[in-house]
Every structure is written in C-alpha cells, then in structure tokens.
Regions:
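Internal alpha-helical transmembrane segments of multi-pass membrane proteins
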Residues: 127-147
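Alpha-helical transmembrane segments of multi-pass membrane proteins
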Residues: 76-81, 114-118, 145-157
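Transmembrane alpha-helix boundary signature
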Residues: 60, 82-93, 104, 120, ...
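Cytoplasmic-side transmembrane-helix entry/capping segments in multi-pass membrane proteins
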Residues: 42-45, 64-76
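Haloarchaeal acidic low-complexity proteome signature biased toward cell-envelope/secretome components but also
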Residues: 1-27, 60-65, 130-133, 201-220
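Interfacial helix-loop-helix junctions of multi-pass membrane proteins
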Residues: 86-95, 147-189, 193, 197
Length: 220
C-alpha cells in the first residue's frame, strides 16, 4: 500500500498540490526580480523548468508519471527555491535560519536523482534477457550514483561561491563549510536508501515504459 492510500490523499489533491507549487515558484521568481536577488531568480527559474519535466516525459515519451511522482519532484525543487527566499520581509533565508532545511532539501533532491538511476538500471535489466542485475547490485548502484551526484553538487556549490566572491556578486548556490558538506552527503545517502528500498512501489510503471522504449529502439 502506498503512503497516499494510508493517508487518504487522492490523486486530485496531489495534482492540486503540485500545481500550487508551480504557482509558488512563479511568485518566488517575481520576488527575486523585485528585491533584486540573482540567487532567488535562478533557483526559481530552474525549479520552474524542472517541474515541466513530468508532463514532457508523459506527453512526448509516453512515460507514465503518477501524480505522486510529479508531487515528489515538485516538492524537491519548490522547497529548495523556497529556502532561498525565506519569510517575506526578512533579510535571512530558510537556509540561513533553519539548520535542518539544507539537509531536508538535499535528501529530497537526492531521492529524485536516485529514482532516475533506479528506473534506468531496472529498465536495462528488464530490456535485455542477457543482463541480470541482482537486487543487491541495484541497491549499491543507486547509492553510488547518488553519492557521485552529491559530490558533484558540493563541488559545484564551492566553485560557484568562490567565483561569485571573486567577481563580487551574489552567489546562486551557497556552501556552509566542510561539516555541512559531510552532513549533506549523509542525507543524500538517506534519500538514496529510501528509493533503493521502496522504489518498486512507485517506479514500476516508469521502469516498464523505459524498458518498452529500449526494446522498440532495438528493433529498428
């Protein structure tokens, strides 16, 4: 049984929540333009681009996107963008005032990356009969791909922060020190473990669609 079934959350409610998050991202974009704050503008704009992916994948590639998956992706980018805005009228963002906000968004973002890795490796496994990927291998693969992406992201944060300091502009991404980086990676692993353990519940349809597309391409 899925979490939404236990909580009694309908698909309509999930779709509305995802839509409200998109509206919220538009609002954050205008807040960033009004302040003006480059970090808010960039993070809100990237978030708006990402939340279009589920409908794009479903419309152009026939990959079924459950409302829960769409809400999952929307939540990750929405909370990240919201963290750069904070409470209206305040000088400080949630990333600066709430110590756990950065770790929450890292776990959510990592779970989305892990889901993409899980769906891909399971689709390859189902597509080719000559390939057999044991569950343990899939689990480890998802962990490794997520950790690798997490390390890349931390390096990117550091590079952008240093470049912004050199040119004297506002940093789009902020790094808060080595200890924070290590904790971020720990929460990345938490997100990956959740997906690697329970990914079958939510990603079966996506895996099936990807495997079908791989088979269709191989037959051409």
């Amino acid at each position: 049984m899925r979490i939404r079934d236990r909580l009694g959350i309908s698909e309509t409610t999930q779709k509305r929540a995802a839509w409200l998050m998109q509206v919220g991202l538009v609002g954050m974009l205008f807040i960033g333009l009004d302040r003006p704050n480059l970090g808010i503008v960039v993070n809100a704009a990237v978030g708006l681009a990402v939340v279009q992916l589920p409908s794009l994948l479903e419309r152009d590639y026939q990959i079924p996107m459950d409302p829960a998956l769409t809400l999952w992706i929307s939540s990750a980018v929405f909370l990240h963008a919201l963290g750069t805005v904070g409470i209206p009228g305040s000088r400080y963002s949630f990333y600066e005032t709430l110590w756990w906000w950065d770790h929450l968004t890292h776990a959510l973002s990592a779970s989305v990356v892990a889901a993409a890795g899980y769906a891909t490796v399971r689709a390859v496994d189902r597509h080719n009969d000559r390939i057999y990927l044991p569950p343990r291998f899939t689990f480890v693969f998802v962990l490794l791909i997520t950790i690798a992406f997490g390390v890349f992201w931390e390096v990117l944060e550091f590079a952008i922060a240093q470049a912004s300091a050199l040119v004297g502009s506002t940093s789009v991404l902020t790094q808060y020190g080595l200890g924070d980086t290590m904790l971020d990676l720990v929460f990345d692993v938490v997100g990956a473990v959740i997906v690697a353990t329970w990914g079958t519940v939510y990603l079966t349809d996506v895996v099936g669609a990807l495997a079908t597309r791989l088979s269709a391409r191989a037959e051409r």
